[in-house]
């Protein structure tokens, strides 16, 4: 029997009840035999370190119903929404997924209408969606009457754009989000759903009574047994980097433009915590997520040529028995290298950037992230 796969682009930061609902809906809406997750690695799209590492989050995903977890590399994950979407669509298409299932505030959004009114000048489009997101959204509203402001609506739109640009390899299946909004900062009492933002805040505070109702048991157990990570853990490393690096070197890093390097360096001298640093550097011109990504690029010493979102390889993080069967089915038809074990060649070659991202986390946690690590196999009993 030929297995058919539905793809999900995700971060599982951490895996919560809303994600479990999405997986169940994906199976119901598509009839897929396999759920494939393209999951951000140790750093996520907001420019933050994931609260748990990619292996812990893979374990939670497999327990929650995902069949195959493949890493969305840092070159795609640490990007503005349009580039994040390009990389994610390419990963799922390369893995021969038939559907892309994604949560959105407005599942009836007319993506075709929006795409028909994109700016004709690519340079303007790039300027809008990287630096002037609000102008871009205003432009589309003026052209179409459609308001594109909610986080998942914006990401869904860029999935549609990327899918069109890549020849529409995936059938889009938008789902109405269940529960709280994407960036809600508090867990509402009496509910089984909360935003990942609120769950991270409660977890970092050790408020397990608040977390318990809104995450599966496996996620709760992992959160309670692991050392949880935030930007605060990397602040000394970032501060040293910003203070010691010449501005001429900083300008060579990815997306460090328009003189922001001077502002970041001054803030590093003044601030004593990462929260202080962000407060000092924030302006109306730049969002917090853009500034956090710039901080991550500098910490990582990322060069523009390293940050191309199109995948160069596919790193398998984990699978169920069904996921393993699907991998066996497609492996001869996948155009990119499938990496199950990171070796020295991977570290020195296509995996260099992700190896550095993992090494940064290892500096804080002491847990190796890449070299020699093999995919997690979901126990048959789960």
UniProtKB/Swiss-Prot annotation:
Annotated GO CC locations: cytoplasm
Matches recorded under Gene3D superfamilies: HUPs
Family: Belongs to the TmcAL family.
UniProt key word 4Fe-4S: no
Primary role: Catalyzes the formation of N(4)-acetylcytidine (ac(4)C) at the wobble position of elongator tRNA(Met), using acetate and ATP as substrates. First activates an acetate ion to form acetyladenylate (Ac-AMP) and then transfers the acetyl group to tRNA to form ac(4)C34.
Pfam (any one): HIGH_NTase1
GO molecular function, one term: ATP binding
Example GO BP: tRNA modification
Main location: cytoplasm
Matches recorded under NCBIfam families: PRK13670.1
Record-annotated disulphide pairs: none
Compartments where found: Cytoplasm
Annotated signal peptide: none
Protein name stated in the entry: tRNA(Met) cytidine acetate ligase
EC number(s) reported in the record: 6.3.4.-
Recorded catalytic activity of this chain's protein: cytidine(34) in elongator tRNA(Met) + acetate + ATP = N(4)-acetylcytidine(34) in elongator tRNA(Met) + AMP + diphosphate
Domain of life: Bacteria
Residues noted as binding ATP in the record, renumbered to the chain: 9-22, 103, 152, 177
